[in-house]
Amino acid sequence: MPGLLVAGTTSDAGKSTLTAGLCRAFARRGVRVAPFKAQNMSNNSMVCQGPGGAGVEIGRAQWVQALAANATPEAAMNPVLLKPGSDHRSHVVLMGRSWGELASSNWFEGRQVLADTAHRAFDDLAARYDVVVAEGAGSPAEINLRAGDYVNMGLARHAELPTIVVGDIDRGGVFAAFFGTIALLSVEDQALVAGFVVNKFRGDLDLLAPGLRDLERVTGRQVFGTLPWHADLWLDSEDALDLTGRRAASAGAHRVAVVRLPRISNFTDVDALGLEPDLDVVFASDPRGLGDADLIVVPGTRATIADLAWLRARGLDRALMAHVAAGKPLLGICGGFQMLGRVIRDPDGVEGPVAEADGLGLLDVETTFGAEKVLRLPRGQGLGVTASGYEIHHGRITAGDAAQQFLGGARDGQVFGTMWHGSLEGDALREAFLRETLGLTESGTSFSAARERRLDLLGDLVERHLDVDALLALARHGCAPALPFLPPGAP
């Protein structure tokens, strides 16, 4: 099948970024290209339109990769989405719809259904597009997971996909990681690995060249290029690993503190705030981090009651109360909004074992979780402007008399709560909100234009630093025969 698998030496090696960059570069050549990830484990997701106009849910990274490919996002691009609610339990989204829960103890019992669905989705995309660029997960050399793999080499074997391995040289040890990744694969899997891409290189490329030549010599595989480290190159993140890379506060700007909840979800909601020139966005997990904030955001979460208990245990509830008492603005989004209400009920254990918990009482609303997940793309009025967003939640909101309506949520003075993810990506709503809460004037920032510039920048870097023609030929025609075997192979 025409396609390519982008595997990585580790998590966060650059698979999502490289996949998006290849999609943009191939699309520029007139190729009808689609992104794909068989299984994504992330609480950052997006709603797109499914059959009949119904909402379907996919990983945020695949949604952005579809934008890079100039393709319409769809459930087949991320057929299995796992949303961790605890260290041992994940909510499963199958072809965009809620499927159920899987615990680590019964993971292998449900794996075959997920694998079959994922491989059918890939085959469907491959039949409709010229090339499918598939992103792997973690590393293909996780020998403890090999038997159940359908995301990395399991997918590559299914579709006979040539595979490239990307490694983050900024972490160090990339040559050992490249060699070791291949050397732990079986003979059959090694035959599908065509070569490497080095990611996040800083410095003089001439100093790296001898190492690249040696890597090609000892592995018998091509290095397709080296992507430079670039400070402005960040895309919608897949998981919380990327939170550590957010910029720190600088003097003079209004400080926005985002509560870093243990099961934080859709933290891309604040990306648009990070582009505003008069704001500095930081993530905080203790009261000191919230103390001097001009605006606090409590984001979404996959475990609302559990994260509310964590928030109280760390004294963050008192910090939020003090912030509101000082007349400063507070915004809660989805699960964060539900925490600001009077009570949260989960009688059926949708999110966890605790059936009921008192909220912070800052908004006159109550939340009750139901089994059916709401997936919507709402549009309406807020703060005098047209706004839009997306909803992904099990919670049903009941508002009291004191609650003033705000974007599917409620407002009381400077305390705002909304069920709409992504509303701040709308320039008009964001400007109105910042004017209302912080007194800021319009900056002229366009979030959608900024995202498109980043995708173009990524495409430019891929075109400039990688052998795109060779990668496209690889995707169309597959690996060269008789690639050398690196011992010891699969244990």
UniProtKB/Swiss-Prot annotation:
GO terms for molecular function: ABC-type vitamin B12 transporter activity; catalytic activity. Coiled coil: none annotated. Residues 253-429 form the GATase cobBQ-type domain. Pathway: Cofactor biosynthesis; adenosylcobalamin biosynthesis. PANTHER family: COBYRIC ACID SYNTHASE, DETHIOBIOTIN SYNTHETASE. Catalyzes amidations at positions B, D, E, and G on adenosylcobyrinic A,C-diamide. NH(2) groups are provided by glutamine, and one molecule of ATP is hydrogenolyzed for each amidation. Belongs to the CobB/CobQ family. CobQ subfamily. This is Cobyric acid synthase. The lineage of its organism: Bacteria, Bacillati, Actinomycetota, Actinomycetes, Mycobacteriales.
